[in-house]
């Protein structure tokens, strides 16, 4: 295939150290051997004058483990379009080591010449492993796609706003976390950063006290167990995108998966602002705490928010934030359309 310019490496979505009968598990060792063979093939191909250079690489279901330096360098040499969908070992939670490796080693190694970048995973980037691209610079990046990137704080998103060359930005099924139930020692073990969040009072606190304000509870070190809330909203984020990315011409914000935007399956029929916020409690992400208690589809940790109109409640947040979020999104979309029309 002398004219090949794109290569997709598709692994099993299931990671396990053992090959179990009747299952499509793929051990880490086999995955690394596969990548090693592919990287060698790519280097051998470069010595053939009649063969094109492969510049686009798709790593579908890449296991969340660091690559050996030589393997990484050989695999990513000449790549300017990189698309990664991460899978977690044995279906477990994401590893902090890989999030750090991604931001400090893998991405910087290709940052100078990368034109397109896609990162997808399952509720990745915040708890239990934070991805923060602070300091990342992609001077040639024109297109960035993130799927299920979970945002705890504004500074987690600032690295995106610093890529001033972006023309296309796709945020698929990305969420801002508004409420979080801190449980110890898990949060200390995970080193969760809730800087800027406010701790809500214990249930026993008198909610009717005139001097009470949820804004008066600063982030504590270490985090005390209990509920915390975050004031960050998508309206703020949309405004910052519009103000900080002057070349942006195409922006997508909707619930969508890899199969839709990358493999061409029909998009789900839902509102662009559908499920844009998340809560975190008892080790899982969700949106049901935004619903009234009598409409909740399953048993949840709801007793805390059953006091009607209590300060900081997530109940009704989707409805309360919808006008500002929609206006900011429409203003951003109008700005991108205007830029396209001016060309």
Q: What are these regions, as identified by a protein language model?
A:
Residues 139-343:
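Leucine-rich solenoid repeat modules
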Residues 1-139, 153-158:
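Leucine-rich repeat
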